[in-house]
């Protein structure tokens, strides 16, 4: 009886018929759905039929059954296709899919017709996943080909560093067919032996190695701490207001969050208007029916609040601002567009019309302009040149975690610091967290080991940092400027939200002379070079919706980097990623329930993710309205260094693998600015200034830690 009441409560008085109630209850049992979830599916079904309300008739319920069946078959096919790798040397016969449906996400073909990249040796694309999609999970080309998937054994995924040609430099000539013997079915968890024995200091990949020599480093390193250098070679200056990051988390105001999201759309409306020389009258509300073409600016959102991760061009809507459309949403018709790359939260500008009141038909997409590049005066550049005495600048970048999953040994970090002091000798060392990872298996389980080297055992995770990390970090030469940037997974941070306040140097008992704690994200200046750093995995979290052969054939990391630059935010995705797991139940409190009830009682707990504080997302935008010279965004994906729109984009990779094997770090060499060598671009104006053109002067080496 209670089930009947739930059905009527959700579906309304039209469901108060015995045959309707019976049919809907049977569907809840058949698909293991609650009445509320079934009603949400019914709304999706109605929306797909372009109806705000669908009558509860026997005919419509039969069609609804087919809708649910198609969704179930789609997910089953995707799961099965992602868990198998074809090891046959014979190219399989590929049959055309005949049952493609325009329902939400079901129009994505499942035929893997794109060629796979050839790998000359095992390497890691992700530290946490064994399957990596080149492009988004819904990436397709204009002929409907599904995205390329590469699968590796768990050992490869954790321990590979990449001694062969990295994916960032793979060429089309290296492609292999799906039957290539390069790809083996995962059968073992044993890491590849050659990957375990990568020597420390081996260069895994390089950007621009032909034109620039590796910097000899900082000549002051090696001097006694009491000896002062004859001159200060580098200046590290923050380029943001640190006080703005000192907000209190978990106090989000819905009105403030709404204002921030609305301001993002309005600010880009002005940028589009100025860039394309449009008048305010050219912009109109895309949700209102009109036969005239208009310009519209808004945010890409899913067409259903219960969307899954498999989006496609047919399941997107445009969210307007209060001024542009009272915050309403309208579904998008992208059939007239040949090339596109969208993701959730992206601010876009369209030209089109809403002829029927249901869809906004996009006729053309207006590319967002890229931000300007930073400049310096000739006097400033000559000063930095004099400080370096004409030598190159050397910067080292590392990213945590810094110990393996089964222990707290920092032996690898100690070896690295010794190498930094005695051999590498950089001017600046940038270290990203997590330092003490709150998701570390031993910390998450509360099973901290005994530390025989300590007289007293650490009682808190803060004490654990002071006893493990602080003594090692203090051994860094005082002539090396060290920058610490936290992670939202850092146990030593009191600010576990993004944007994130900096660590407290005094609490970490680190010397003031050469240690600087920066926020996450942060922009800072090293001499004339502007660095933009963010410690949230944008490259992994950004899932694109792709259409068009030209777009899908481009390297995915280049596309994601361009999105970041165009959106002018280090994390342009909204909503942010969330990683959860099923919370284990206490055996003593388990109840005797049937299978259905036990499924409904699963409790999910939050592990990590972007953890966005929406009210303060303005702090994640590029400071000053210009792009950085060097943008560093660590990711769990394969390390890489690229030049995208004259910006050097770097992912240094993980410092250590989960199994304890060596990871990677980045070494940046930037030639000293020289007004005479032609690598700086003069910009005429009231006061002549020069573009830094760091991408012409920089070399990046990705090195085994």
Curated annotation (Swiss-Prot):
Residues with PTM Phosphoserine: 126
Note: Present with 11200 molecules/cell in log phase SD medium.
Gene3D superfamilies (alphabetical): 3.60.21.60
GO cellular component: alpha DNA polymerase:primase complex; nuclear envelope; nucleus
Subunit structure: DNA polymerase alpha:primase is a four subunit enzyme complex, which is assembled throughout the cell cycle, and consists of the two DNA polymerase subunits A POL1 and B POL12, and the DNA primase large PRI2 and small PRI1 subunits. Subunit B POL12 binds to subunit A POL1.
Protein name, UniProt field: DNA polymerase alpha subunit B
Functional description taken from the UniProt entry: Non-catalytic component of DNA polymerase alpha, which in a complex with DNA primase (DNA polymerase alpha:primase) constitutes a replicative polymerase. POL12 may play an essential role at the early stage of chromosomal DNA replication by coupling DNA polymerase alpha to the cellular replication machinery. Interacts with MCM10.
InterPro entries, sorted: DNA_pol_a/d/e_bsu, DNA_pol_alpha_bsu, DPOA2_OB
Taxonomic classification: Eukaryota, Fungi, Dikarya, Ascomycota, Saccharomycotina
Region Disordered, residue ranges: 115-199
GO biological process, one term: telomere capping
Main location: nucleus
Alphabetized UniProt keyword annotations: DNA replication, Nucleus, Phosphoprotein
Biased composition (Low complexity): 181-197
Tagged with keyword Hydrolase: no
Alphabetical list of PANTHER family matching this protein: DNA POLYMERASE 2 ALPHA 70 KDA SUBUNIT, DNA POLYMERASE ALPHA SUBUNIT B
Location relative to the cell: Nucleus
Homology family: Belongs to the DNA polymerase alpha subunit B family.
Post-translational modification remark: Phosphorylated in a cell cycle-dependent manner.
Claim: Phosphoprotein is one of the keywords in the record: yes
One GO molecular-function entry: DNA binding
Polar residues bias (residue ranges): 125-134
């Amino acid at each position: 009886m209670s089930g009947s009441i739930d059905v009527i409560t959700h579906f309304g008085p039209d469901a108060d018929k015995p045959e309707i109630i019976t049919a809907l209850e049977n569907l809840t049992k058949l698909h293991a759905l609650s009445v509320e979830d079934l009603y949400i599916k019914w709304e999706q079904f109605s929306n797909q039929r372009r109806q705000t309300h669908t009558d509860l008739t026997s005919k419509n319920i039969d069609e609804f059954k087919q809708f649910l069946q198609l969704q179930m078959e789609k997910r089953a096919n995707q799961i099965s296709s992602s868990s198998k790798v074809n090891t046959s040397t014979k190219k399989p016969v590929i049959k055309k899919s005949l049952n493609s449906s325009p329902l939400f996400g079901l129009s994505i073909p499942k035929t893997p017709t794109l060629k796979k990249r050839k790998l000359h040796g095992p390497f890691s694309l992700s530290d946490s996943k064994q399957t990596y999609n080149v492009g988004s999970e819904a990436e397709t080309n204009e002929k409907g080909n599904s995205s390329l998937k590469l699968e590796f054994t768990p050992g490869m995924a954790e321990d590979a560093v990449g001694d062969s040609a990295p994916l960032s430099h793979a060429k089309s000539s290296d492609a292999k067919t799906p039957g290539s013997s390069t790809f083996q079915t995962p059968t073992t968890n044993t890491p590849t032996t050659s990957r375990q024995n990568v020597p420390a200091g081996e260069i895994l990949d390089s950007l621009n190695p032909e034109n620039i020599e590796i910097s000899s480093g900082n000549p002051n390193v090696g001097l006694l701490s009491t000896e002062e250098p004859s001159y200060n070679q580098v200046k590290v200056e923050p380029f943001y207001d640190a006080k703005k990051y000192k907000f209190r988390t978990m106090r989000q105001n819905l009105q403030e969050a709404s204002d921030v999201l609305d301001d993002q759309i309005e600010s880009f409306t002005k940028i589009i208007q100025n860039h394309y020389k449009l008048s305010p009258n050219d912009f109109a509300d895309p949700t209102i029916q009109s036969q005239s073409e208009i310009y519209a600016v808004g945010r890409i959102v899913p067409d259903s609040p219960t969307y899954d991760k498999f989006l496609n061009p047919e399941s997107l809507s445009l969210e307007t601002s209060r001024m542009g459309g009272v915050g309403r949403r309208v579904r998008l018709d992208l059939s007239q567009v040949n090339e596109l790359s969208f993701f959730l939260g992206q601010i876009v500008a369209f030209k089109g019309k809403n002829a029927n009141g249901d869809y906004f038909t996009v006729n053309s997409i207006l590319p967002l302009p890229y931000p300007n590049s930073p400049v310096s005066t000739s006097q400033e550049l000559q000063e930095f040149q004099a400080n370096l005495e004409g030598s190159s600048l050397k910067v080292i970048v590392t990213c945590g975690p810094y110990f393996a999953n089964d222990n707290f040994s920092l032996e690898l970090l100690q070896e690295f610091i010794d190498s930094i002091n005695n051999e590498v000798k950089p001017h600046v060392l940038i270290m990203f967290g997590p330092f003490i990872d709150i998701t570390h298996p031993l910390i998450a389980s509360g099973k901290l080991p005994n530390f025989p080297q300590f007289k007293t055992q650490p009682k808190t995770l803060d004490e654990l940092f002071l006893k493990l990390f602080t003594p090692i970090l203090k051994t860094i030469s005082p002539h090396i400027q060290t920058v610490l940037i936290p992670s939202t997974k850092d146990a030593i941070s009191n600010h576990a939200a993004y944007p994130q306040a900096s660590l407290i140097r005094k609490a970490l008992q680190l010397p003031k002379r050469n240690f600087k704690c920066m926020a996450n994200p942060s922009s800072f200046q090293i001499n004339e070079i502007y660095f933009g750093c963010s410690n949230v995995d944008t490259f992994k979290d950004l899932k694109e919706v792709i259409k068009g052969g030209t777009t899908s054939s481009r390297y995915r990391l280049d596309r994601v980097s361009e999105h970041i630059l165009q959106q002018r935010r280090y994390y342009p995705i909204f909503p942010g990623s969330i990683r959860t797991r099923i919370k284990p139940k206490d055996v003593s409190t388990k109840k005797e329930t049937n299978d259905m009830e036990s499924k409904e009682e699963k409790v999910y707990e939050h592990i990590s993710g972007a953890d966005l504080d929406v009210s303060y997302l303005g702090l994640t935008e590029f400071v000053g309205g210009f792009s950085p010279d060097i943008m560093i965004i660590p990711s769990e994906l394969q390390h890489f260094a690229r030049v995208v729109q004259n910006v050097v984009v770097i992912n240094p990779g993980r410092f250590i693998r989960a199994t304890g094997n060596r990871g990677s770090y980045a070494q940046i060499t930037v030639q000293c600015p020289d007004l005479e060598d032609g690598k700086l671009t003069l910009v005429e104006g009231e006061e002549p200034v020069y573009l830094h053109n760091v991408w012409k002067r920089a070399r990046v080496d990705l090195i085994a830690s």
